[in-house]
A protein has these predicted regions:
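Glycine- and small/polar-enriched repetitive beta-structure motifs of secreted/surface proteins
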Residues: 2, 44-424
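Short, surface-exposed terminal/edge motifs of secreted or surface/virion proteins that either
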Residues: 2-26, 54-63
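A generic structural signal for solvent-exposed, polar alpha-helical segments
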Residues: 18-21, 26, 39, 196, ...
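Surface-exposed, low-helix, low-complexity loop/repeat segments of extracellular attachment proteins
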Residues: 25-57
C-alpha cells in the first residue's frame, strides 16, 4: 500500500496482526518457492526442505517418488515402499525397494534394484534389476545389471558383472565376478567364478573355484579348481580336478582327480582320471588314459588310452599311445615308444627309439637307445646302445654290449664287456 488511502497496489492481502501484507503472485522478494523458478537465492540460507523433525516427501501422479527421512532415503518413481519400517535404507531408481517392509540396512541403486525385497537385510544392489526378486536373502552384494536378479533367499553371495549369478535363487556363499559368471547356478553354494562366463552353465556343482574367462563354463561337477582362460571349459560332471594354464583340461567331461598345469596340458582328456600333467602340452592328447604322470615339455604328449605311465623330462614317452606301465626319467627317454609296456628308462636318451618292446630296463646315457625288442637289461654308459632286435640280454658296465644289434641271451658285466658282440 502507498502513503495515501487510495494508493494501493492491486492484489490479495492478509492481516499479519499489525498490517496488511500483499500475497505475492509472481517472482518477488518473499520466501515463497515458485514453480516457474526462483531468482536471488542464497545457497547458504535458501533450501527446499523442513526445519522440524518431519519427513520430506516427493510425489509424481500421487505416487511417492522421493523421501528424506531420518533412517530412509529414496528418489525415483515408486521407489521405497512408503509403509517400510526398516532403517538404514537407500533407494535410488524407479521401483527400487518398492516392496520392502522390515528389511534394514539396504542399498538399492538402479531401476528395479531389490524390487521384491521384503524382510531381507544387509543387501547392496547396484544396477538395473540387480537382486530384483530377492525377498528374504541377506548379506548379498550385487553390482551390475541383472546381477543376482532371481535371488530370493540366498545369502552371503557376491555377484559383480552383467548377469553374474543372475539365476541364483537359494544358493549361499557364492562369488561371481565377471559378465555371465555363474549365470545358470540356481541353488548351489560355495562356488567362486572369476572372469567372463566363468562357471557360466554350472547348475549342480559345488565347491568349485574357476578363475579365467570361460573357465569351467559348462561345469556341473564339484570340487574343481581352475586358473586359466578356457580351462576345464567343457567339464560336465568331472570332479576333484585342478587345472592351471590356458585351455588346460579343456575337453574334460567326466574325468576326475586330474591335476594339470601348463599350456594345453591334458587338453583332450575326456573321461580319464587320476592323471598328473605338468608342462607345455603334457598329456595333451590323452582322452581316457588313467593314472599317468607326465612332468616336462611334451611329456606323454600323444598318450591317448594308456594308463599307469610315468614320464619325467623333456619329451619323455612322447609318442606313447596305448602302451602302459612305463617309467621314463630323463630327456627323450622312451620318446618313440607307442605300444611298448612295462619298460623302465632312466637317463638321457635311454630306450629312446623303443616302439613296441616290453619289459626292458635301461639306466645310463644312451642305454638301449635303438632297442625295439623285449626283456633286456642295460645299466651303464651307452650299454646296448646299438641293440635293435636282440632280446633277453643283461649288460652291466661302461659300454657293455655296446655294438650288439640282434644278439640274444647274453650276459655282460664289466668295463666294455662284450663290446663288439653284434649278433651272437
Amino acid at each position: 500500500a502507498g502513503t495515501s488511502p487510495n494508493n494501493v497496489t492491486p492484489g490479495f492481502y492478509y492481516w499479519d496482526g499489525a498490517k496488511w501484507v500483499r500475497l505475492q503472485t509472481g517472482a518477488g522478494t518473499n520466501n515463497s518457492w515458485l514453480t516457474t523458478g526462483n531468482t536471488g537465492t542464497n545457497a547458504s540460507t535458501n533450501f527446499l526442505g523442513t526445519i522440524d523433525n518431519i519427513d520430506l516427501v516427493f510425489k509424481r501422479n500421487n505416487t511417492q517418488s522421493g523421501l528424506l527421512n531420518e533412517f530412509r532415503t529414496s528418489f525415483g518413481y515408486n521407489s521405497l515402499n512408503p509403509a517400510s519400517t526398516g532403517v538404514g535404507l537407500v533407494a535410488m531408481g524407479v521401483s527400487s525397494l518398492s516392496a520392502n517392509t522390515t528389511g534394514s540396512y539396504l542399498t538399492a541403486i538402479g531401476n528395479d534394484a531389490l524390487n521384491k525385497n521384503t524382510t531381507g537385510s544387509q543387501n547392496t544392489a547396484i544396477g538395473t534389476a540387480a537382486m530384483f526378486n530377492n525377498t528374504i536373502g541377506e548379506y548379498n552384494f550385487a553390482l551390475g545389471n541383472d546381477a543376482l536378479k532371481q535371488n530370493t533367499s540366498g545369502s552371503f553371495n557376491v555377484g559383480i558383472g552383467v548377469a553374474a549369478l543372475t539365476s541364483n535363487t537359494l544358493g549361499n556363499r557364492n562369488i561371481a565376478i565377471g559378465n555371465d559368471a555363474l549365470k545358470s547356478s540356481t541353488n548351489k553354494s560355495y562356488n567362486i567364478g572369476i572372469g567372463e562366463s566363468a562357471l557360466k552353465n554350472n547348475t549342480v556343482g559345488e565347491y568349485n573355484i574357476a578363475v579365467g574367462s570361460n573357465s569351467m563354463e559348462n561345469n556341473s561337477g564339484s570340487r574343481n579348481n581352475v586358473l586359466g582362460t578356457f580351462s576345464l571349459r567343457n567339464n560336465t560332471s568331472g570332479s576333484d580336478n585342478t587345472a592351471i594354464g590356458y585351455e588346460v583340461l579343456y575337453s574334460n567331461t567326466t574325468g576326475y582327480s586330474n591335476f594339470a598345469g601348463g599350456y594345453h596340458s591334458l587338453f583332450s582328456n575326456t573321461i580319464g582320471g587320476g592323471n598328473i600333467g605338468i608342462g607345455y602340452e603334457a598329456l595333451t592328447l590323452n582322452t581316457t588314459g588313467n593314472s599317468n604322470v607326465a612332468l616336462g615339455y611334451e611329456s606323454l604328449k600323444n598318450n591317448t588310452t594308456a594308463y599307469s605311465n610315468i614320464g619325467i623330462g623333456f619329451q619323455t614317452l612322447f609318442s606313447t599311445t596305448t602302451g602302459g606301465g612305463n617309467i621314463a626319467l630323463g630327456a627323450e627317454a622312451l620318446k618313440t615308444n607307442t605300444v611298448g609296456r612295462d619298460n623302465i628308462a632312466l637317463g638321457l636318451n635311454t630306450l629312446t627309439k623303443n616302439i613296441n618292446g616290453n619289459y626292458n630296463f635301461a639306466a645310463g646315457f644312451n642305454a638301449l637307445l635303438n632297442n625295439t625288442a623285449s626283456n633286456n637289461i642295460a645299466i651303464g654308459y651307452v650299454s646296448q646302445t646299438a641293440n635293435t632286435a636282440g632280446y633277453s640280454n643283461i649288460s652291466l658296465g661302461f659300454q657293455t654290449l655296446m655294438a650288439n644289434t640282434t644278439g640274444y641271451n647274453n650276459t655282460s658285466i664289466g668295463y666294455q664287456s662284450l663290446l663288439n658282440n653284434t649278433t651272437g
